[in-house]
């Protein structure tokens, strides 16, 4: 993978679901919504001074949100931070850098 470039989209794994679950409260606070369903569908990664995870999350039958989560390097602060999100997405919308 090229540093700074986005990886290919991959199906979400249990680890990616855990990442999404950890930042769910941050997203709910920012959007002022509560999500009963919060299922990670696919993801891309971007290597920076840590890793950006771009995750497509299904929040309702036909509603999707793209979230961007930053994880710092282990020698730094490796906590997960929601750094961006895009609402109003569909199942077919491609994950892109934002």
UniProtKB/Swiss-Prot annotation:
Where in this protein does the record say N-acetylmethionine is found? 1
Its family remark reads: Belongs to the cystatin family.
* UniProt site positions, description: Reactive site: 4
Asked if the keyword Acetylation belongs to this entry, the reply reads yes
CDD domains in UniProt: CY
Q: Give the function comment from the record.
A: This is an intracellular thiol proteinase inhibitor.
Per the UniProt record, the source organism is: Felis catus
Which GO biological-process labels does this protein carry? Answer: cell-cell adhesion; keratinocyte differentiation; negative regulation of proteolysis
Name of the protein described by the UniProt record: Cystatin-A
| Cellular component terms (Gene Ontology) | cornified envelope; cytosol; extracellular space; nucleoplasm; peptidase inhibitor complex
Query: What is the superkingdom listed in this entry's lineage?
Result: Eukaryota
- In Pfam terms, one family for this protein is Cystatin
């Amino acid at each position: 993978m090229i540093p700074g470039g986005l990886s290919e989209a991959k199906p979400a794994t249990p680890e990616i679901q855990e990442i999404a679950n950890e930042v769910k409260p941050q997203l709910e606070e920012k959007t002022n919504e509560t999500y009963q369903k919060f299922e990670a569908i696919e993801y891309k990664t971007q290597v920076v001074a840590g890793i950006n995870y771009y995750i497509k999350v299904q929040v309702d039958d036909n509603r999707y949100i793209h979230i961007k989560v930053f994880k710092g390097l282990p020698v730094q602060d490796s906590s997960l931070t929601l750094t961006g999100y895009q609402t109003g997405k569909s199942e077919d919308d491609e994950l892109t850098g934002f």
